[in-house]
Amino acid sequence: MEPPHILIVDDEPNIVMSLEFLMRKAGYRVSIARNGTEALEAVDQTAFDVVILDIMMPDVDGYQVCRHLRQRPDRAGSRVIFLSAKSREADIEKGYEAGADLYVPKPFSTRQLMQQVQQLLPPSA
């Protein structure tokens, strides 16, 4: 059985690098999208187990990517974690309304994030 496949979507290179390192170290397959447009293409081509998604990106924002993903019945199994500096209650609510499974405000604990990813994955993963 293949390891879980994680898509990391963020326009901040340092966050992408550290998350990619942690996810690969944990044994996950990792794909990267550096903006919302790349994320839309990626979710159209591949069913990911977990999508870690920034909200504020220059082209297509994370809310739009999440809504797009949720409109695809063949991607119903994909779990979405918003990782964002937008931490007001209204922003968090908007994230859940867009279809997020989890909303993690930046700055975040990488250890906690890894635990949360593990909890969102099916037990066999």
Regions from the language model: what does each represent?
Residues 27-34, 42:
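Short hydrophobic/Thr-rich beta-strand motif most characteristic of the beta2 strand and flanking loop
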Residues 47-52:
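Active-site beta3 strand of CheY-like receiver
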Residues 57:
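Receiver (REC) domain active-site loop signature in two-component systems and cognate sites
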Residues 54, 84:
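Active-site residues of response regulator receiver
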Residues 17-25:
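Charged docking surfaces used in two-component/phosphorelay signaling
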Residues 108-117:
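C-terminal output helix
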